[in-house]
């Protein structure tokens, strides 16, 4: 299969059946967003936001893109900026992994670190400061950009509809910017009226559950606030996940299924176990889909804890 550039390989990710990980009566499927060229689902929104800005005349060949990011969006933006020739400055909390920073540097991006205790709010504030100081700059504002939601309505959800024409009962997915869960929930619920969409967030920062924001180790999951593009009316439930159980299922999935995915993946798998396995409230014929937005390579920083 031939493509004219790396950007054409974004999307159309595979869906794989889980066979050995759970003792379950459900037919469980996982959508592998790690198959995107930058290694995560964030490649989709990076391309969408930049092309939306181009169409609106907000970017030109001399523009600088500045974005606060927890990691994967930064990698996606770095990949797209490299192909399109834009200068990119990424702002992130210092708690984000060294692996992600090195990948961004490999694509040619510059980055600025902010205090970990300020979380993503601190990164957003710093990005806004840099934008004011930098002529001809543009901030994608992934937490507020409608293009983030739109790309998931138009691509991710359509791929799911094509793969599951018979329908789905549950979708379990995490919340970072809120674009993915909002986009697929909006599109899928139009076709699957009985679909239940379950959001996953860190137990140490359970903002959607009514708790307080706090630092946590599940990178990319839980921004510490409710993003403006997140439509909480589309959610049928919110569940939390802890670090230890998440790591446990990351390595079990690798050993039993040959699927080595990242923090989103491990959190969803552990939540599936607690939510579905042995729960008589769920029908034995239920069909759940779990999304896995990143590669397991991003876990290697903590490999001593999971291997």
Curated annotation (Swiss-Prot):
Catalytic activity: O-acetyl-L-serine + hydrogen sulfide = L-cysteine + acetate
Entry-linked Pfam families: PALP (PF00291)
GO biological process, one term: cysteine biosynthetic process from serine
Enzyme class: transferase
Cofactor(s), names only, from the UniProt record: pyridoxal 5'-phosphate
Keywords recorded for this protein, A-Z: Amino-acid biosynthesis, Cysteine biosynthesis, Pyridoxal phosphate, Transferase
Documented EC number(s): 2.5.1.47
N6-(pyridoxal phosphate)lysine modified-residue sites: 42
Pathway terms, separated by semicolons: Amino-acid biosynthesis; L-cysteine biosynthesis; L-cysteine from L-serine: step 2/2
GO terms assigned for molecular function: cysteine synthase activity
Protein family per UniProt: Belongs to the cysteine synthase/cystathionine beta-synthase family.
Protein name as catalogued: Cysteine synthase
Lineage, highest ranks first: Bacteria, Pseudomonadati, Bacteroidota, Flavobacteriia, Flavobacteriales
């Amino acid at each position: 299969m031939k493509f004219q550039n790396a950007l054409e390989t974004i999307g159309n990710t595979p869906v794989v059946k889980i066979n050995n990980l759970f003792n379950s009566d459900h037919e469980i499927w996982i959508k592998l967003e790690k198959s995107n060229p930058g290694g995560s689902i964030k490649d989709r929104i990076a391309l969408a936001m930049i092309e939306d800005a181009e169409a609106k005349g907000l970017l030109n060949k001399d523009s600088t893109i500045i974005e606060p990011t927890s990691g994967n969006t930064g990698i996606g933006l770095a990949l797209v900026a490299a192909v399109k020739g834009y200068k990119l400055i990424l702002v992130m909390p210092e708690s984000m992994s060294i692996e992600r920073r090195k990948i961004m540097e490999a694509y040619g991006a510059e980055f600025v670190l902010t205090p970990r205790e300020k979380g993503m709010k601190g990164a957003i504030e710093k990005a806004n400061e840099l934008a004011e100081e930098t002529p001809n700059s543009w901030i994608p504002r992934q937490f507020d950009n409608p293009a983030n939601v739109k790309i998931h309505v138009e691509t991710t959800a359509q791929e799911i509809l094509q793969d599951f024409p018979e329908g789905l009962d549950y979708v379990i997915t995490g919340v970072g910017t809120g674009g993915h869960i909002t986009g697929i929930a909006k599109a899928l619920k139009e076709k699957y009226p009985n679909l239940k969409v379950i959001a996953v967030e860190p137990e140490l920062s359970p903002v959607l559950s009514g708790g307080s924001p706090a630092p946590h180790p599940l990178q990319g999951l839980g921004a510490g606030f409710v993003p403006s593009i997140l439509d909480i009316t589309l959610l049928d439930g919110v569940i939390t996940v802890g670090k230890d159980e998440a790591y446990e299922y990351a390595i079990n999935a690798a050993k039993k299924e040959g699927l080595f995915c990242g923090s989103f993946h491990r959190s969803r798998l552990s939540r599936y176990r607690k939510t579905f396995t042995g729960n008589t409230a769920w029908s034995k014929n239920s069909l759940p889909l779990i999304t896995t937005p990143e590669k397991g390579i991003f876990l290697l920083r903590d490999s001593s804890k999971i291997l």
